[in-house]
UniProtKB/Swiss-Prot annotation:
Cofactor(s) required, per the database record: Mg(2+); Mn(2+); Co(2+); Zn(2+)
UniProt entry tagged with the keyword Disulfide bond: no
Top-level taxon in the UniProt lineage: Bacteria
Active site: 8
Catalysed conversion reaction: 4-amino-2-methyl-5-(diphosphooxymethyl)pyrimidine + H2O = 4-amino-2-methyl-5-(phosphooxymethyl)pyrimidine + phosphate + H(+)
InterPro entries assigned to the protein according to its UniProt record, in alphabetical order: Cof (IPR000150), HAD-like_sf (IPR036412), HAD-SF_hydro_IIB (IPR006379), HAD_sf (IPR023214), HMP-PP_phosphatase (IPR023938)
Organism of origin: Escherichia coli (strain K12)
Annotated binding of Mg(2+), by residue: 8, 10, 212
Protein name (record): HMP-PP phosphatase
UniProt pH dependence: Optimum pH is between 6 and 7.5.
């Protein structure tokens, strides 16, 4: 029996309308009744996730910013990882050949250079939103991550530019087909989950995890039981062909799987 369950949010636990379904909330409550530790592992900001947990009265550990921060049940900071100032400066000041919008994150929030109302649709559940700033005046010493949002083909070309400029000084990953992230070296959800399990006195073999994008890859391969969403990025499924694929987030597939796991642990599972 797993002792910890780690969940990506967008494309995994959240439905396409960016809400948590009632079946999902009920299943999370059942896991807690079984003394299974809940962990939300997401690219979203800690401030937003703490608000969501409070609104839902959920007790869960948080891995946020794709592993840049880990918080306890009480909100205590257990781990932090920031971009080096010179890396943040290069990414912010360089003229990149891209149409993608740039977004900067630190402990105070989410910052960008212009209004992009369409991006806020993903945050209707929490009301979290960006702050408009002159990105060239952003303090460089506390940037957790920088991400670019836009067309996937454009982001793929940008990824090549970033690799050429940064080399091994940053970790690049797609958290969605339309979002490319620049993270500290060695920073990912899997590394953050390792920190958390050590804090809790658990083994990664004691954990299960669910995800749908390339920023979930390290987490999914490190745990005892990793599960890929039916709506996952094709790249993730191609890289991890040995992991089981469950249903679509629109059908609350994580809840569907876990209900079977809780009620019929010895029977084979079908996502249908």
């Amino acid at each position: 029996m797993a002792r910890l369950a780690a969940f990506d949010m967008d494309g995994t636990l959240l439905m396409p309308d960016h809400h948590l379904g009632e079946k999902t909330l009920s299943t999370l409550a059942r896991l807690r009744e079984r003394d299974i530790t809940l962990t939300f592992a997401t690219g979203r900001h800690a401030l937003e996730m703490q608000h969501i947990l409070g609104a839902l009265s959920l007790d869960a550990y948080l891995i946020t910013g794709n592993g840049t921060r880990v918080h306890s049940l009480e909100g205590e900071l257990l781990h932090r990882d920031d971009l080096p100032a010179d890396v943040a400066e290069l990414v912010l000041y360089q003229q990149w050949d891209t149409r993608a919008s740039m977004h900067i994150f630190n402990d105070d929030g989410w910052f960008t250079g212009k209004e992009i109302p369409a991006l806020l649709q993903a945050f209707v559940y929490s009301g979290f939103r960006y702050q408009i700033i002159d990105v060239k005046k952003m303090p460089l010493g506390s940037v957790t991550k920088i991400c670019f949002c836009g067309d996937h083909d454009d982001l793929t070309r940008l990824q090549i530019q970033l690799y050429e400029a940064l080399g091994e000084r940053a970790h690049l990953c797609f958290s969605a087909t339309d979002c490319l992230e620049v993270l500290p070296v060695g920073c990912n959800k899997g590394a953050a989950l390792t920190v958390l399990t050590q804090h809790l006195g658990l083994s990664l073999r004691d954990c299960m995890a669910f995800g749908d994008a390339m920023n979930d890859r390290e987490m999914l391969v490190s745990v005892g039981s990793g599960f890929i969403m039916g709506n996952a990025m094709p790249q993730l499924r191609a890289e991890l062909p040995h992991l089981p694929v469950i249903g679509h987030c629109r059908n609350q597939a994580v809840s569907h799987y876990l209900t079977h796991w809780l009620d019929y642990p010895h029977l084979p599972y079908s996502p249908e």
